[in-house]
């Protein structure tokens, strides 16, 4: 079973992009509350 590098990159981006987006929103909200 070969590892499809493009599928791996797509999966990594699919996970990292929303995570980074949520982290940015969290940091902005935390700084506003402070």
Swiss-Prot record:
InterPro entries: PSII_PsbM, PSII_PsbM_sf. It holds the Pfam family PsbM. One of its GO terms (cellular component) is photosystem II. It is a single-pass membrane protein. It is found in: Plastid, Chloroplast thylakoid membrane. The keyword Cytoplasm does not apply. One of its GO terms (biological process) is photosynthesis, light reaction. Coiled coil: none annotated. This is Photosystem II reaction center protein M. The lineage of its organism: Eukaryota, Viridiplantae, Streptophyta, Embryophyta, Tracheophyta.
């Amino acid at each position: 079973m070969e590892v499809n590098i493009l599928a791996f990159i797509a999966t990594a981006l699919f996970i990292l992009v929303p995570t980074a987006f949520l982290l940015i929103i969290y940091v902005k909200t935390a700084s506003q509350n402070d």
